[in-house]
Amino acid sequence: YSQVARPRF
């Protein structure tokens, strides 16, 4: 995917 927001753990 392009420009994907990574979930904060």
From Swiss-Prot:
Alphabetical UniProt keywords: Amidation, Neuropeptide, Secreted
GO cellular component, one term: extracellular region
Primary localisation category: secreted
Tissue distribution of the protein: Widely expressed in the nervous system. Expressed in corpora cardiaca, hypocerebral ganglion, frontal ganglion, protocerebrum, antennal lobe, tritocerebrum, thoracic ganglia, esophageal nerves, recurrent nerve and frontal connectives. Not detected in corpora allata, circumesophageal connectives, subesophageal ganglion, abdominal ganglion and abdominal perisympathetic organs.
Phenylalanine amide modification, residue list: F9
GO annotation terms (biological process): neuropeptide signaling pathway
Localisation: Secreted
Keyword Signal set for record: no
Similarity section: Belongs to the NPY family.
Described purpose of this protein according to its UniProt entry: Accelerates ovarian maturation in females.
Protein name listed in UniProt: Neuropeptide F
Species annotation: Schistocerca gregaria (Desert locust)
